[in-house]
């Protein structure tokens, strides 16, 4: 997987023993991430869609590192392949350095005080393996969180809004297809996903 990441190539699927159990998948992800020398610029919550968690019989999502070389600016292109699963609209948060001095428990009530800015993001989701579909949450978690690239939008100073019920849509300009979504399908809401990552 590290070779596939560094060389931007697809490899044969890794053995199921690394993906069927989320704990094994997490250990593999952490090991692979430790072999990447590029700067870590953030973290993402993955597998946050409640229907997916229920289908895969998992109780909570996972998190993974976002490396600097995987972050794109608006207008840049992304190469996709048959192992690309799709794209997701995300909410990104910029966290104040004070958070790292915090010794208390992160809750839904206090998580907001550590946020300085928020921004829209688009994540390109997929594997670095020659496989498709999702049988286990570990399929995603083990493969660098299934994060291929991150497109970061303009950041805005954080203010409290009803982030738990924001509608959004993505349009494919070439085909005209429109996909609608809502933040209420994301592990209750994006702030709860952030609380999970920070905890």
List each language-model region with its residue ranges.
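Catalytic-core "active-site belt" of small-molecule-metabolizing enzymes
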Residues: 1-195
């Amino acid at each position: 997987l590290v070779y596939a990441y560094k060389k931007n190539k697809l490899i044969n699927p890794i053995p199921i023993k690394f993906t069927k159990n989320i704990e094994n998948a997490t250990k593999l992800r952490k090991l692979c991430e430790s072999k990447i020398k590029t700067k870590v610029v953030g973290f993402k919550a993955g597998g946050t869609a409640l229907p997916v968690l229920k289908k895969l019989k998992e109780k909570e999502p996972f998190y993974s590192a976002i490396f600097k070389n995987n972050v794109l600016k608006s207008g840049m292109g992304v190469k996709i392949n048959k192992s690309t699963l799709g794209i997701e609209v995300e909410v990104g948060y910029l966290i104040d350095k004070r958070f790292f001095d915090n010794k208390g428990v992160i809750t839904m009530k206090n998580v907001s005080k550590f946020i300085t800015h928020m921004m829209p993001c688009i994540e390109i989701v997929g594997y670095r393996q020659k496989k498709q579909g999702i049988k286990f949450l570990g399929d995603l978690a083990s493969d660098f969180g299934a994060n291929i690239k991150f497109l970061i939008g303009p950041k805005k100073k954080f203010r409290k809004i009803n982030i738990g019920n924001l509608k959004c849509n993505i349009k494919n300009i070439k085909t005209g297809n429109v996909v609608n979504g809502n933040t209420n399908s994301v592990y209750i809401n994006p702030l709860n996903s952030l609380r999970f990552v920070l905890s």
